Amino acid sequence: MEKLQPARLEFVAYDTPYSAAFDDVYHSALGGPAQARHVFLAGNELPARWQDKYRFVILETGFGTGLNFLATWQAWRDDPQRCRRLHFISFEKHPFTLADLATCQQAWPEFAELAAELQQKWPPLVPGMHRLHLNDGQVILTLTFGDAATQLRSIDASVDAFFLDGFSPPKNPELWSPHFCKGLARLTAPGATLATWSVAGHVRQALKDAEFDVAKRPGYIGKRQMLVGRFRSRRPDRHVAPTDRRAIVIGAGIAGSSTAHALAAAGWQVTVLEQATAPATGASSNLAGMLRPLPSADDNRLSRITRAGFLATRALLAALPEARWSPCGVLHLAREPEHEGQQRRAVEQLGFPPEVLQFVESDEASRLLGQPVTIGGWWFPNGGWVQPPSVCRAALAAFPERITTHFNAAVARIVRQNDQWQALDANGNLLAEAPVLVMASGAAAPRFEQFAWLPQRSGRGQVSHLPASVGKPLNTVLFQIGYTIPAIDDTQLIGASLSYEDDESAEREADHRDNLARLRLTLPDFASDLDPATLHGRVGFRPMSPDRMPIVGAVPDTMTATPNTRLHNIPRQPGLWCVQGFGARGIVWSALMADLLVSQLEGEPLPLERDLVDALDPGRFLIKAARNSGGELPSDEETSEPAA
């Protein structure tokens, strides 16, 4: 994995920001905002083309200082006929640090309010996609930090307008190549347009070869000409937005509540059906759970998804002031010296900013924790603990005009009648009806006929509650063999046990004893006199997928596939979706998976790279079965993470 190198901010004549890496300026010295409006907005016939539409999607090839985005956002805000949702996708190989971004944007006082909101939500400089919900969720900025030439193929979107604004072709040839232009053409919506300041002959030819009709237009001050274009193919739009935005969500745990919140934020009317008397009574009822990503030296799929999920959860928590959580940090100690070396090397290889991930030696780990430890490990300064029930309640209450909850509503079966999904109780009474149904009932999902195929196992987990007076108070969440969460409401949490083929709902003293034993391996003197027979806690059942990845997407309409079947060729049951298989990572995954599912439902740009979306698709298990590549559930340290 190539480390992300931040841009180095420099200025040349007229205080114009300049890139030493590409030996080029970020925008015209003769008026950046005016250039953005002339070339990219007017060149794409905006704002006229987005007027009276539900959504409009723009893709930009270089985010740079954010000037084009701010100019577009401002034009959208000023237009009373604007589209309801504006998506803006942009790439940046060398993003600015927050401080440098703010310095650049000080030059445009007309964008001060918008720039402040953007800066408030500016993501840490780590590779991958970053989804920012701005302007009360009506403007969605999807930033991809990395090389656009290689990242373009990971985008799944239907683009209405392209802003071709890389550095000059001689300095940045990859973003003007025939191959790149054909990649842009793959993403076009019907009637898609483009605009760029470059009129180089080979750029025009590359765009023509990619089926764009191009023409020269008068350029901005100091540049005689610019280029505009329109995609000439009439292929149908693959991403059609639904017209009837009503959905049923079964389950009010953290998966279902987050999904209902995301649907409502996108304008859907949502009915949540929960068999219990309140939200978050199953695996999401823990007093608290851990929030942190899971890095790997090779930045594998699990690492990338948990990192994206961690950032999405942080963003959701910021939008839900009633949700209870603490960014106290998470200390993930190594198991033994060899593992300590692996952790240290992973931090060096990843090169993430210190606010995301650090390696700390044992003395610094002891200082952070407030307890002596004998080994170092990973430190996540922005991690912490989250109280899942408070998140569920806050999410369900955020849109009272769009979310209707029904508790004590036990769904016995679901059927599809007249293009509507119906949720029925045991007596056949109709509980709810809608064209879309999302299954988010965790371990209970396989009892429904349409989900009997679901290859998830129920993992029984037990956490133990310790009085806050036991041991010296911890400053951070601690994880090693097991985990410990600092005192919340006079209670510390330790855990968690894990067993399969085990439906015992009562607490077991043996599991409390095991939880204490894991804690004492890390902190030998902590709670050394505590009798496990005196402890209480809670038991939950986690839905675990075979590959430990979530199961999110449209539900297959067939239970068979061939080894050569492609995911997108598997037929799907109309209107039937699932967000399942979160296992012990419900806190870190729920917000991101909800965003992904809503984006798929709406036909909007996806918040994850295509390979990660495929790794979550429910249809993957059919293909794996056909290839005889299914595997046993792995056994690793992560099995003792808290359920949420």
Swiss-Prot record:
Residues 1-232 are annotated as: tRNA (mnm(5)s(2)U34)-methyltransferase. GO terms for molecular function: flavin adenine dinucleotide binding; oxidoreductase activity, acting on the CH-NH group of donors; tRNA (5-methylaminomethyl-2-thiouridylate)(34)-methyltransferase activity. InterPro entries: FAD-dep_OxRdtase (IPR006076), FAD/NAD-bd_sf (IPR036188), MnmC-like_methylTransf (IPR008471), SAM-dependent_MTases_sf (IPR029063), tRNA_MAMT_biosynth_bifunc_MnmC (IPR023032), tRNA_MNMC2 (IPR047785), tRNA_S-uridine_synth_MnmC_C (IPR017610). The keyword Methyltransferase applies. Its cofactor is FAD. Residues 250-644 are annotated as: FAD-dependent cmnm(5)s(2)U34 oxidoreductase. This is tRNA 5-methylaminomethyl-2-thiouridine biosynthesis bifunctional protein MnmC. The gene is mnmC.
